[in-house]
């Protein structure tokens, strides 16, 4: 890959390209057949940052995405054009960013896993044109309570929308019959995390909440509860860490404090729950 950067005043522009030559081969030991496939692709990208002030900047970019189909596959390559536009703030102990994103897929690939019972593992399927868009928000802030004690907080949230742009019948079990405008499965609308930490010289006490909205497990546009779906959930975790030395630390965690129970997936073999309330101890050594 290669990147060229140009700077004019408070604006920086990066123009890049990545080139890949892919040689693939698949052997069928039952039939003795060997299939070879050669692919070459160049993916360009362009991004820019505009420093509005010492604390505020605006950034954006356009990037070509690519995921090759396997050498023995009848599926087309996965290709996409990805856009982002955002604003970033940083001042002393505060950092924040807001980013909008949009991914325009010319073709989406679905890949059969070993756990999928109605397709051959490794087989690939065309999903046609797909659009995925959303907004990401992040916020970090720290307050010095004393020379040796601080309070740190963070918040991260992602909102995502998705839809198929064509109607088709697929042998991929996660898709099946897809109608134009259907939302994609396994892309939750809302995902987030909130974290609060009390930090001393050699110790840290932290509480965090991970949350996720209900999630489709089959394509559709009707009420999500009218079809196969996973539950929404909010899980509280607590942890305490103590540094014995610069490299060695001990940590105790109470995960899923409230013992929240939720079905997180119905595939591959029926409903699966999240982790129940658990106590975990760790010894960490950093090299």
Label every PLM stretch briefly.
Residues 7-10, 22, 125-220, 243-249, ...:
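Gram-negative outer-membrane beta-barrel transporters
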Residues 25-32, 69-76, 108-116, 160-173, ...:
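Outer-membrane beta-barrel translocator domains and adjoining extracellular loop/strand segments
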Residues 86, 138, 273-287:
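Outer-membrane beta-barrel "beta-signal"
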Residues 10, 51, 57-61, 77-146, ...:
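Membrane-embedded beta-barrel scaffold of Gram-negative outer-membrane proteins
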Residues 1-105, 197, 245:
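Structural signature of Gram-negative outer-membrane beta-barrels, strongest in the C-terminal barrel
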Residues 257-279:
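Predominantly the C-terminal beta-signal and adjacent terminal strand-loop region
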Residues 4, 15, 46, 60, ...:
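Membrane-embedded beta-strand positions of outer-membrane beta-barrel proteins
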